[in-house]
Structures are given as C-alpha cells and as structure tokens.
Curated annotation (Swiss-Prot):
This is UDP-N-acetylglucosamine 1-carboxyvinyltransferase. The gene is murA. The modification 2-(S-cysteinyl)pyruvic acid O-phosphothioketal is found at residue 117. Pathway: Cell wall biogenesis; peptidoglycan biosynthesis. It is found in: Cytoplasm.
Length: 422
C-alpha cells in the first residue's frame, strides 16, 4: 500500500492543468450501454474509479480500446451480459449507474447493491423508486437488485423526495429509452447532469429544462441510441482543490482548463476570505492574501457550496484568522478528517453536523490517515503548510478521484513523494 511523504512549508508557484471530471465521466461511461454505435470519450481522468467503471462495462460485454491514456472507445452494440456482479460493483457506489441503462435497453438486469464509499448512508432507494415509477418491477435478492420491465419502460413523473445526483442520472438514462414523456421533479442541477443530458441529446433524446430542478424527457422509441463522441468537462472539484492549495500556502497559482462558472460558490468564498482572483475564460489565478479572514460555510446542492470541497476548506480554515464555522447538511459522517487534522495541530471542535475551527494555527508534521476521497486531499493541503514532514496513509482514497496529484503539486515546487508502506 502506498503513502505520501510531504515536506511542509515549501514555497509554491506555477500553473496546474485540470483533468476531466470524474463525476461527469462515470455517468457518461454508464450511458454508453444505451448506444448501438461505438462512442469515443475524451479527457477521461486516469483514476481508480474510471478504471473500475471501464472494467464493469467490459464485464458486461462492451468492447474497450484505449486510444491514448485519456481517450476510450467503447462499443456496446453486442452486449451479452446484464448482470453487474458484486466483485466489480462493491468497489464503488457509482456502479449503481448501470441500473438505468441496462434496464432500459434489455428490459431486465441484475445489479449488485453497491459499496465503495465511507460517507454515511447513501441509500439506493431513490434509484429503485425512480425505476418503479417508469414501470419496472424491483426485488432485492441475495444482495442484488433484480429489475424487470418485460414490455419496456413507460414515461411518467418521477418526484425525488431528496435531491440525488446519481438518482437523477439513473432516471435520465432510463427515461431516454422509455415510451412517452418523463418528468423528473426535484432533479439535481449539477454541471455533470447537464453534460449527461447533452450526451443523451446527441443520440436523439429530447430533454428540456437542463440546469433547472425539473427535467422533461421524451424517450427514443427504439431498442438503443446512437450516441456521439464526447469530451468530458473539467473537474470543478479538482480545480477547487488546487485553488485551496494556493490559498492554504498563500501562493500565486494559475489553474488552467476550467469552466469558472462551475466554481462560483468556491471562488466567492475565497474572495470573501481575502484572496484576489484573476478569472479568465478558462483559467483562474489566485494571488496571496494580505490577511485571511475566518469564514462560514453551509454545504448545499449545486449551485450552493459543494460538500466535496468542505474538507479542503476545513484545512484552509486552520490558517485563517478567527473562528470559522462549517455546517455539513448533505451527508452524515463527513467530518472524519477533523480528528486527523487535529493530529497535525488543528483546533477543531465538532457538534453533530457543525465544525468550528479556530485559527490561525501552526500545524506540525505527523502521520495521518485518509478516510475518504476528499478527506485525503484535505490532509495533503494541511501537510503542505505543516512544519516538518507528514505522511498521509491510505491514499488509495486519493487515487479514486485525483489524477497524478503528487506530480501536479511537485510541478509547483512542492516536495511530495509516493512511497510503499513497509
């Protein structure tokens, strides 16, 4: 198992190229199961979750060819398998995204209940109810979801009691081959949803209301779609993380290959803290702040402040003057990084879903353990400003969502080494 050894308090400067968005790539990979013709997907990040989804598609009978490290050609014309097995699905929760396309195209499928994420309860109930609204019969048998719609899916209203990104994505993919019109009410509004909609539209699906909380889909009355090639949008969470690298080290960094509009909740907060940002069409440059002020954050669905940036801002709060307050409203158990930040010297108190951070605090290098994907990046951020050497263990979490993180940070001047546990 690998760990990162990080020498703290090293000056940083330079530019970072942002990779394609993992959270856009995963549903788009799943959606290729709907396609009769081969599809080329560009700007795929080389991260563990993408490789796991590619392996799952291959296991279902899709043909895969990597044209270069970030471009994959997928052919799902002659799929011969509609069972997503536990061995593959347990590796990540996003595997549930194959449920909608498999059911829509083949009228029956078996999908293992997912694993792969340590952040509280992320129930699949919303996905199952959405499929039932479209006419599917669902049973849970020996840890598998067995979904059937012998006569095909039929358009209907799907009302989500709670906003769900993957639930919205699964409903969209299922509705794309359903007869008639489907309305998804209380839909998620993330940019990744908008890109999935554009991908489905390329195959002839009519979708209205993109970017709003109500989506209207007219399915293609056929047994498959003819989807077109697509380039994955830049990863707004990776971009936000590197902005936080600049912010926590108080360095001048330029973040390239981004869509600034997708980052507004993050950039607004950085400006409030005291940073000067030069925002261009596809880049943001962060300049050192004279004084970093404490702040308050409440995580919300897009376009609110993203829960996936909460941990990084908790690390940043340790270097801000005053008392910062972070309220997590979307997931339980999402403060597991707090105790590890405390090992580095952070002054953090927790009360249910609210964290209070007192700063500014001098952090000291230590051994810390990553507990989930975004927590791992928060520990790397803190280690960059800690006095001495830190070792971040269990970085397989980090590898799920960040492409070549140590290479990108080292290119800025950092001293980060990936080593093997003894």
């Amino acid at each position: 198992m690998d760990f990162l050894e990080i020498v703290g308090q090293v000056p940083l400067k330079g530019e970072v190229e942002i990779s394609g968005a993992k959270n856009s790539a995963l549903p788009i990979l799943a959606a290729t199961l709907l396609s009769r013709q081969e599809v080329k997907i560009k700007s795929l990040p080389q991260v563990v979750d993408i490789k796991a989804m590619a392996l799952l598609l291959q296991n279902l009978g899709a043909s895969l060819e990597w044209l270069n490290p970030n471009t994959l050609q997928i052919g799902a014309k002659s799929l011969n398998h509609t069972e997503a097995t536990y061995d593959l699905v347990r590796k990540m929760r996003a595997s549930i995204l194959v449920l909608g396309p498999l059911l829509a195209r083949f009228k029956e499928c078996l999908v293992s209940l997912p694993g792969g994420c340590a952040i509280g309860a992320r129930p699949v109930d919303l996905h199952l109810k959405a499929m039932q609204q479209l006419g599917a019969k669902i049973t849970i048998e020996q840890g598998y979801i067995h979904a059937k719609a012998p006569k095909g899916l039929k358009g209907n209203d799907i009302l989500f009691d709670k906003i769900s990104v993957t639930g919205t994505e699964n409903a969209l993919m299922a509705a794309s081959l359903a007869k008639g019109i489907t309305r998804i009410i209380n839909a998620a509004k993330e940019p990744e949803i908008a890109q999935l909609c554009a991908f489905l539209q390329s195959g002839g699906v009519e979708i209205h209301g993109i970017g709003s909380s109500e989506l209207k889909i007219r399915g293609v009355e056929n047994d498959a779609l003819n989807l077109k090639d697509i380039q994955i949008i830049p990863d707004r969470i990776e971009a936000g993380t590197y902005l936080c690298v600049g912010a926590i080290t108080n360095s001048q960094l330029k973040i390239n290959h981004i869509i600034p509009n997708h980052l507004q909740a993050i950039t607004d907060k950085l400006i409030e803290i005291g940073f000067s940002l030069d925002i261009q069409e596809n880049s943001i440059e962060i300049h050192p702040a004279k004084k970093r002020q404490a702040f308050e954050i409440t995580t919300k669905e897009y376009p609110g402040f993203p829960t996936d940036m909460q941990a990084q801002f908790m690390a940043l709060a340790t270097q801000c003057l005053g008392t910062s307050v972070i309220e997590e409203t979307l997931f339980e158990n999402r403060f597991m990084h707090a105790s590890e930040l405390q090992r580095l010297g952070a002054n953090i108190s927790l009360k249910t879903n609210v964290a209070t951070i007192s700063g500014s605090t001098e952090l000291t290098g230590s051994d810390v353990m990553a507990t989930d994907l975004r927590a791992s990046s928060a520990l790397v951020l803190a280690a960059l400003v800690a006095k001495g050497v830190s070792r971040v263990h269990r970085i397989y979490h980090l590898d799920r969502g960040y492409e070549r993180l140590e290479d990108k940070i080292n290119a800025l001047g950092a001293k980060v080494a990936r080593l093997k546990e003894k």
